UniProtKB/Swiss-Prot annotation:
It is found in: Cytoplasm. GO terms for biological process: regulation of DNA-templated transcription. This is Probable transcriptional regulatory protein BRADO1143. Belongs to the TACO1 family. The lineage of its organism: Bacteria, Pseudomonadati, Pseudomonadota, Alphaproteobacteria, Hyphomicrobiales.
């Protein structure tokens, strides 16, 4: 089950600056409200809401903000948001998936298409690039929760598909169908994970040169800064030096 991870999730860049916190909290609150509206407002009984709350806590979102977002769902908010997945190609032919929650489909589509076009890429049809990714659940724990072997044994017992442990922590992968049960079992053993969410994992990654990498990072930032965009995934790798230069 062990393996070398080439999965570098560019979406984490959106939280790297304090100036982005307010916008990030707004996006997290929107997901919490929609998740609570679609299911029960009790995180213990609503796996999607539970994942949204975990994500919010990982970003140090205040408890009052989380509770307020849940109460909005009880008050009828969250009904007008549509979940949309956009797919396209960025500079260098890199595959990009964008997940959005929007109350204005036309605005979101127009803005996102414009971002792709300005970057030298193009927005495609649904399904145009997602076949190059696997839909998986990821549960992340800090390095300190347990040894590599202990996490591996617990993950196998819980029904996980893969485990990657390194200096940055432990990443446990599971199928979408078993994800919530695996996360629940691991949380009972190791405590609340720092992340638990469904994600798009590239089947393969593409190394790009610095010029293309700069264009791609700028595209990722444009997308992540849009109010309607929740998550962005791409199948490229850039050098650590360029990532540092770009502020990643």
């Amino acid at each position: 089950m062990a393996g070398h991870s080439q999965f570098k999730n560019i979406m984490h860049r959106k939280g790297r600056q304090d100036a982005m916190k307010s916008k990030l909290f707004g996006k997290l609150a929107r997901e919490i409200t929609v998740a609570a509206k679609l299911g029960t407002p009790d995180p213990a009984m609503n796996p999607r809401l539970r994942a949204a709350v975990v994500a919010a806590r990982a970003e140090n979102m205040p408890k009052d903000n989380i509770e307020r977002a849940i109460k909005k769902a009880l008050g009828g908010e969250g009904e007008n948001y549509a979940e949309i997945r956009y797919e396209g190609y960025g500079p260098g032919g890199v595959a990009v998936i964008v997940e959005a929650l929007t109350d204005n489909r036309n605005r979101a589509a127009s803005d996102i298409r414009s971002f792709f076009t300005k970057s030298g890429g193009n927005l495609g049809e649904t399904g145009s690039v997602s076949f190059m990714f696997d839909r998986v659940g990821i549960i992340e724990f800090d390095r300190s929760v347990a040894s590599d072997d202990s996490v591996l044994d617990a993950a196998i017992e819980a029904g996980a598909d893969d485990v990657i442990s390194g200096e940055g922590g432990h990443e446990v992968y599971a199928s979408p169908d078993s994800f919530h049960e695996v996360a629940k079992n691991l949380e009972a053993k190791f405590g609340e994970p720092r992340k638990a969410a469904l994600t798009w994992k590239p089947q393969n990654t593409v190394a790009v040169d610095d010029e293309t990498g700069e264009k791609l990072v700028k595209l990722m930032d444009l997308l992540n800064e849009h109010d309607d965009v929740q998550n962005v995934y791409a199948n490229f790798e850039i050098s650590d030096a360029l990532m540092a230069k770009m502020g990643g």
